[in-house]
Structure formats: structure tokens, C-alpha cells
């Protein structure tokens, strides 16, 4: 039977196995945006909203976290999070949500504008008798981008402590 979504494409099926385990203490892509969260050339329209959802597991030894959303092959930053303190956690679940809205669409070149916001949430570990979960908000920076070429939404993470982040799934859809 054909797909009968109440949402709009791009229609990219989520991965059927875990993506690469991430362990760097420097900035790194959480997944390959060109593969898992693409936005095809000329698909964006003024007012169109793209939604990215992802989840997996995370292990941390405390430290800090920064989450940075980016657009397209040039890596245009859409507003990094504040530097947030993290707790120690072992194999905690995480969930990420990011919505990107195109405000204007222009001619070829960086003549279209978009803005987005989202969050990454994961359970807290027990540190000195506390069990604080982390919710890291990011985005909010309006950006000028080129929508006449293939683009993508890439979410990047920077964790300062020893860490293991396993993206288990990621999806993209548009609401309109």
C-alpha cells in the first residue's frame, strides 16, 4: 500500500540500525545530514517548516555540552546552545527535536532566510545526591541560505568529558 502521510516530504526512512558511536570531545556531526536529514533543492517555500527528530543513548562523565544546528553544505550555523553543565550518566536515553522555518525564499545564492529552534533532552545521573536531567535548548539565529541547491539539517555536539553518544534513529518531515 502506498504511504498516506499527513505530513510532507522529504521521505527519508529512519536508519534500521544504530549510527556511528560518537566519542570525540571536539565538535562532531551527530549524523550525516546529507544522508538522513536532507532538504532537496527548490523544496523550501516561505512558511514551510521542516522537523527533525532523533533519539538514542548517551553515557557521560560530566563536563559541558554544546549543541549546534547547521544548514547545508556550507555549515551555516543556526544558533549554538549555551555551554551547559552535564551530569554523569550511564546509557541514558536522549531525545532531540528541531524545527526549521523558512521565512523568505530568494533567487539563487544565499538569498533565502530561515530560523529554527530545538532541544536535546537526556536523563541525569546521580551526582552528589542529585539526579538532574539535562535539557539543552539551541537555535534561534536567523540565517541566510541558498535553497536552490541540495541542503540538509545537521545537528552537531560538543561534549567536554568522556562520552559515548549513539544515535539510534533520526527522521525528517515537514508539516506543510
Positions of predicted regions on the chain:
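Surface-exposed molecular-recognition determinants
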Residues: 2-176
Amino acid at each position: 500500500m502506498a504511504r498516506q502521510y499527513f505530513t510532507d516530504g522529504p521521505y527519508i526512512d529512519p536508519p534500521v540500525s544504530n549510527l556511528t558511536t560518537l566519542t570525540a570531545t571536539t565538535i562532531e556531526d551527530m549524523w550525516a545530514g546529507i544522508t538522513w536529514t536532507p532538504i532537496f533543492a527548490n523544496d523550501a517555500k516561505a512558511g514551510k517548516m521542516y522537523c527533525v527528530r532523533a533519539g538514542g543513548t548517551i553515557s557521560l562523565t560530566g563536563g559541558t555540552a554544546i549543541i549546534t544546528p547547521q544548514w547545508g553544505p556550507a555549515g551555516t550555523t543556526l544558533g549554538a546552545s549555551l555551554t551547559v553543565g552535564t551530569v554523569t550518566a550511564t546509557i541514558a536515553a536522549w531525545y532531540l527535536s528541531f524545527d526549521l522555518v523558512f521565512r523568505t525564499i530568494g533567487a539563487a545564492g544565499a538569498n533565502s532566510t530561515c530560523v529554527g529552534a530545538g532541544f536535546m533532552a537526556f536523563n541525569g545521573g546521580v551526582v552528589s545526591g542529585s539526579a538532574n536531567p539535562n535539557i539543552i535548548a539551541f537555535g534561534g539565529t536567523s540565517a541566510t541560505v541558498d535553497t536552490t541547491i541540495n541542503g540538509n539539517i545537521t545537528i552537531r555536539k560538543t561534549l567536554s568529558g568522556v562520552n559515548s553518544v549513539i544515535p539510534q534513529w533520526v527522521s525528517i518531515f515537514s508539516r506543510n
